Amino acid sequence: MSLDRILIANRSEIAMRVARTVADRGGKSILPYTAEDLTAPATALADEAYALPAGSGYTDAQAILELAKSTGAQAIHPGYGFLAENVEFAKAVIEAGITWIGPAPEAMEALGDKMSARQVAESAGVDPVPGITDAVTEASVVKEFAARYGYPVALKRTDGGGGRGITVLYNDDEVDTTPALDEFQTATPGTAGGTVTQILEKFITHARHVETQCARDAFGNFAVVSTRDCTLQRRNQKLLEEAPAPFLPADIEQKLVENSRRLFEAVNYVGVGTCEFLYTDEGGLWFLEVNPRLQVEHCVSEEVSGTDLVDIQLRLAEGQRLPQLEPVQGHSIELRITCEDPSRALAPTTGTITGVHWPAGHGVRVESGIAVGDEVTPFF
């Protein structure tokens, strides 16, 4: 089955990125947009763009699904963020007879929070960061764990991601005073529905954040497109990513590939995704999580492999076999440009974009969703 009409349930640069590949394949892109994005470049680029109802937005699953039905979309590409990891939305898309461009909801559910992902890793023989897989609400449990593994330790919301929901504790006094434990004494609503808890892990300092860009088809064929290093972060948000991850010993790289394969096979993962790990120079390697979607930093893997990962996503969603991938060549570095105010400790800021001058030349790639005159709002 050829997917020719793709609704992109997202905005800005990732919507433009997906739309480019859809066009390259000869298909049509359909884009929902909010009032704030009426004049956005992504809205202009899409073959068809439709305003979402007043008061709804990019997380309004029902509005987006109704738009997909009314426009004859064959598939929905969620991009990243918003509804990309919403299991109930993925189920609703499939139940409506529309192709979900991503792993099956069952795989998403198994990997969708940090607690269940740890359980998957353990069952697959992949070592997670030392921690407690059960829900943690008591200070005594944290202190007992720290007595065994040492401080610092990290409390993590099971639905956290993108640097959200992490509380690092460095001593018993901080454990006694942190509000993070009080928050989970009663049922806490999750960011994508349901309720969440938090787990406890050893916070490993001076570790590198390395990951594998993976793909697996419905026939069991698996490949790592490239490794990546995403160690340089601020406030647990990635700022600079490099592919392949430099200075990895051959045995560690082989272990990354094998661990990633085990994780994908454990949940019968079909699609494109990323396995994230911590690595220390002493040889420690621990599993963090699987991101069941495209990531911002997918571009560096594409550049060193000559692979279009969005095209791979669409092929796998069509039921095709994973194509033969080229060996990695060279290195690619991505730098995220953020809208922050240096006079306010680099706090996120808003305003009108008065000028943009992008770099150009051989080997330079720019992924953007902005133009001069655009307003950076607090809404996204």
Predicted regions and their residues:
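ATP-dependent carboxylate activation and anion-phosphoryl transfer catalytic cores
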Residues: 2-29, 46-50, 69-71, 94, ...
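Conserved beta3 strand of the protein kinase N-lobe
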Residues: 131-132
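Conserved A3 ("GATE") glycine/threonine-rich loop of ANL adenylate-forming enzymes
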Residues: 114-116, 159-165, 330
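Short alpha-helix boundary/capping motifs
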Residues: 96, 148-150, 174
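Conserved, charged catalytic cores of large soluble enzymes
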Residues: 169
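ATP-binding N-terminal substructure of ATP-dependent carboxylate-amine bond-forming enzymes
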Residues: 1-124, 136-144
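Acidic/histidine-enriched active-site and ligand-binding environments that engage anionic O-linkages
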Residues: 144-155
